[in-house]
Amino acid sequence: MREQRATAPRTKPALLTRLNRMTGDGTPVVTYSIIAVSVFVYLLQLIPALGVTEALLYAGAYSYPQFFEPWRMLTSVFVHSTGGFPFHILLNMYTLWIFGSLLERMLGRWRFLVVYLLSGLAGSLGVLFLAAPNVAVVGASGAIFGVISAFLVIHQRLGANMTQLVVLVAINLVIGFIPGFGISWQAHLGGLIGGALLGLIFVQTRKRSQQTLQIALLIALAAVMILLSFSKFLV
């Protein structure tokens, strides 16, 4: 019996096998995971008693010493407007599915995650510095603008013609300035700038011999963003 057990082939659960295939064939796992988490959080938001939206949204006031809750600068990226038809989350997740999948395959999973999170943080910094402290924001738009911006910068620097995408981004940015749409242009602009900086870092340090420099620049950029998030302590 012992000999039979030792020689018998070991089988993996179907779920583990599928996950191994996904992580090995270029499937944009991080993009899909972000979409899944965002949808799950949205469903929780629909239960008023949980108070998810109020607990995770961001406003500039939460970066002031009196109300300091810095985690909201990132958690707000995963919550969306729940009023009426779920247009907000559907549009954001559809856009993320398109550009996130492309950028993740290009950069790899961990680099893409860095782009998404730091772009989201940059979007919140835009709200902190450009919006009134009591203006609350939710949504992944800042992070997604960063993803698109990084995608655009990388392709532009590599010689691709990105004119149509530049026009599309410009139109969406301008729409944010139109009163009545309820769009946070501040988050869009912040994410756009953050994503562009990240794109420049990746495209300028794409050689294998520059990996240490790339990591150092990413850490430096993240450190600057974190320091900026504490800026209201100096006021």
Q: How should these model regions be labeled?
A:
Residues M1-T23, G176-V235:
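C-terminal transmembrane module of polytopic alpha-helical membrane proteins
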Residues G26-A140, I178-Q186:
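N-terminal TM1-TM2 helical hairpin plus the immediately adjacent luminal interfacial "cap"
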Residues I34, S38-Q45, W97-I98, A150-F151, ...:
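Alpha-helical transmembrane segments of multi-pass membrane proteins
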Residues L90, A140-I148, L189-I193:
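Membrane-embedded alpha-helical segments of multi-pass membrane proteins
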Residues G100, A150-I154, G195-V203:
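Hydrophobic transmembrane alpha-helices
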Residues E104-L107, H155-A160, Q204-T212:
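Membrane-interface helix-boundary motifs at transmembrane edges
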Residues L118, Q164-L173, Q214-A222:
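Central hydrophobic cores of alpha-helical transmembrane segments
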Residues L125-F129, G159, A196, L200:
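Membrane-embedded alpha-helical segments of multi-pass transporters/permeases
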